[in-house]
């Protein structure tokens, strides 16, 4: 009898193991047989493969896209080509997790790419989402595939993500007997613009959109990116500032503006209050540069922080927010034309691969704005259809963003209120915007940028600390986020968290009230 009592736990454990193996085998078998079950218009399945967690995938990609990706959890990986016109197709992947939560999610892209965001596919599938991602209708990060190829360009503007969602939802229903309960979109930068395109042109296609650092006002953005080269000139010109010079400018901006939020912590909480005066850095007579700037360089700084206006003084794009100079200088003020802008005018605006980007003028911006193919501006300020659909949109923008000015997101917010005739509180019912102090472009930065918008910023999956899960709670429980809590890492994700800070819902801003020091999250208040 005693022997039997000892055997029972063993038998129970063995049965559990056998059951787990059986479930896993069923999932793997379902995956390996899945390709033969897919019969959708315009969809050609390349393969459906079971990928166990911890696998390091080698990706068949062009050199400018990801070459490998560690898969965090067991998935069924489905790769396919989807025809979008007689002259275009997208490469689409769906990652179906074994530990499925009944949620569907589409990822976005970045830059002018061209590249499936495999890290986002892994991040969302690890969290239990059936996840899709596409290559935006072309391969690589260059704009050259747009050259005399309007169908490829149309895929880039909107059709790739929309098609991926339509096909992805069908596949999810086919793969899982229970289908899906809720649907989401997650993207940043170009991915942010794609999220806004969904909101503007396909309201209700997903239940929740997380759209970070959005490249909306897209042609204005590329014009703004292009206009820095005429301001700074090439390396070595009188108007050019070295990286050391920009470090000097950054320290002076902090001296003038850091304390305006109540704490000197190297982070500017509200750039709207900061209007840098670079004349304080002007070299005295006889002084050598290195710890000061020439009058010509001072003028360069002031021009960099001015908005971009058309030839008739109409706003094209707002100013670069001050406070992120150490990130912006190597990317935007490096003495070379900005690559994405150069590609846009060469392969889209003028269809002339020999066009000289160093000759860019405001007239080129105006020509591009008149063109605006497929309304890539993504600047429609009436989101009434999105509101009426019941869908939610959460957007965020880093206040040290070096590639897309956070002022553009604020400009759009105010355009929404004016166009729709609503108050901030009314907008909050379906649209919330969070300024993330100390965050550069979509990730990294000097402050509490760990908000879970991607794997590279994740420290928690609690809704208070993770924008994706905050959206899930908003959609599924009706609890909208009041703040987004970010983590300041000592040395990137996975390192020690130095402090936390709650980022405010716009138009509120963070103010240090004390009594603790600036690392105490309770010492800050949204006002």
Curated annotation (Swiss-Prot):
Belongs to the tannase family. Glycans are attached at residues 56, 86, 139, 277, 312, 356. It comes from Emericella nidulans (strain FGSC A4 / ATCC 38163 / CBS 112.46 / NRRL 194 / M139). PANTHER family: FERULOYL ESTERASE B-RELATED. One of its GO terms (cellular component) is extracellular region. The lineage of its organism: Eukaryota, Fungi, Dikarya, Ascomycota, Pezizomycotina. This is Probable feruloyl esterase B. Involved in degradation of plant cell walls. Hydrolyzes the feruloyl-arabinose ester bond in arabinoxylans as well as the feruloyl-galactose and feruloyl-arabinose ester bonds in pectin. The active site is at 189 (acyl-ester intermediate), 401 (charge relay system), 441 (charge relay system).
